[in-house]
Amino acid sequence: IFEYPIEGLPLGTYCMGVDSINSNESSDRINSLATAYILKRTHDPLGKFQYHIVASYAGRPKLVTEFYELCEMLADMYNAYILPEFNQSFVDHFVNQNKGYVLWDTPQLSIDIKQTAFSSKMASHKKGLNPTPTNQQFGMDLAVTYSKAPIDYIEDRKVMSRVLGVNRIYDYMLLEEMKNYKSKPSSSKGIHDGNFDRLISFYHALILANHLDKYLPMDKFISNKDKKEEPRLQTPA
């Protein structure tokens, strides 16, 4: 945890990206990690951790359900919406816990990523983003833009200097993945040449934050500090 949740911030301030795992046993050939990253959107331009990663997890729990429960607890703790890479078991866990609303609906998001021609597989679910080359490239483009963007370095609520956006990333293992990233020349099964689980979760958080910035600006959200039921969004004026 890089910053604990700030009480009273509007629902939608925190966006969680998730890359889950499919089985309890790790493969000898491919040792994937279960990962989750929480990004805080900007709510105070001169405050700390604006558009920063505030929490992250990467590991291989003995049981897949332990990871699902961890994500559920993090979402409750930060009052966050989740955009996972599509995994039916992950979606089922939240639906069975009556928390399906925490998972952001993806149809409009997919349209934004220029996927207007849905295959039957894509049309069969509304939660989670399919790992298609188009979606992966969109996420990678956001991660690159985020890292290269010039940002103001603020101290005591004063702008002191300008630095690259990558300075907002305090997760060293994510930085290591980004440094060692390799892509495939061309593939119908994805663009990543290797396991980049942290990066995948990170760009899912970015995709969701970018989407909410466009369609649901912070001032349009109901404060959800004392959430006791499914949160609802105010209709934009």
Each language-model region and where it sits:
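RNase H-like, metal-dependent nuclease domains and their acidic two-metal-ion catalytic environment used
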Residues: 1-108, 152-237
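Short alpha-helix plus adjacent loop in nuclease-associated cores
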Residues: 105-160
